[in-house]
């Protein structure tokens, strides 16, 4: 008797892969269940910008053939996943959530896409996002908003909103997103899934549409800590096509996963719990910290004194880099081209006017101003100095602890439309996540319960030393094992 499609969709990533390997279920069954789930739910969720049904079915058929021969590429072989529409995919539209790339068909795959497919994972589609990854609510998508599976009137977070919503809703077993200032961890927290921002340089950015090149990083989202660890192990490692890619060997993330929290020193920054948090979020975070103490970890008071300047530094550095990266979208080589322009300069201007949304334009203006003659030293250079101080704060804190723990966001998922008219309020959603990017450190969001008042998920943020993702996974798994999984969100 076959397993109902809905049950297949709620299987963990490793559980689904093991089922394919044991021939208890087929990759074709998993993929058809995923496609049916997307068809049934995405009209309300809006998590997908493109569904690659034919490509996915062909990949599933190949995975089943390998299973029949007793071959297995990896634990991911035959399992449906999806990727943010920021990763180029050969022959599949890649828009970065922007009109200016509407209809663009890349001639090659991003490195992380190559690595997923080499491991046998089946990519079923491309996921919704804020335009060029600029946003914290997925409302900046040029195509449609994405909704939170826990409450369709609320944001899933951004910019990787589709990546989190698709996993939480059981459309796929895992996904990839990008994180420039919190864009994996915030949606993961809002949607009640695990989201990982690796150390800068741990995962190749080749084939990822650039936002802020010194901050962008690729990472996984999944419903279980171990599943996220497996995906990261699959995509991590040196890539000669990305000059920022580290040559450091990839650690075994799964080996220490079940070692527990006993003996861990968990740093708690006093600046992160000193105000500005909604009461329900603070209660959930403090309860999670108490759980670590109960499990044998030692809570250590640490200070990150320059973290209060993180928002200001980030919103100078990131727009400055974006203003350069987005200069290539001019209507000449690919994407939207304005018709009827009387000359080259007018065509440039009209193509960008028609193709770019309000948030990219705002950040291009901010970045161009910060880099302009007479203002570079006062703004951009000073922001980079603050970045150095933030990195030193973390170095000092890690002298006395193994991981740092605190909130991901000041609140649970907020209502769609609530902050679109106030960019500053939107930017403040990233207040706890931005410093991790500025310091190039690994960070992770793991569910730590539901807020009592709203019943919405709360995420605990864990930050680690450079390239010590293994300790983050160990600490996150200890909490996950003790608290148990969150219930599935309501049916859309």
From Swiss-Prot:
Keywords: ATP-binding, Ligase, Nucleotide-binding, Protein biosynthesis
Gene3D superfamilies: Amidase signature (AS) domain (3.90.1300.10)
EC supergroup of this enzyme: ligase
GO terms assigned for molecular function: ATP binding; glutaminyl-tRNA synthase (glutamine-hydrolyzing) activity
Taxonomic superkingdom: Bacteria
Described purpose of this protein according to its UniProt entry: Allows the formation of correctly charged Gln-tRNA(Gln) through the transamidation of misacylated Glu-tRNA(Gln) in organisms which lack glutaminyl-tRNA synthetase. The reaction takes place in the presence of glutamine and ATP through an activated gamma-phospho-Glu-tRNA(Gln).
Name of the protein in its database record: Glutamyl-tRNA(Gln) amidotransferase subunit A
Source species: Anaeromyxobacter dehalogenans (strain 2CP-C)
Lineage: Bacteria, Pseudomonadati, Myxococcota, Myxococcia, Myxococcales
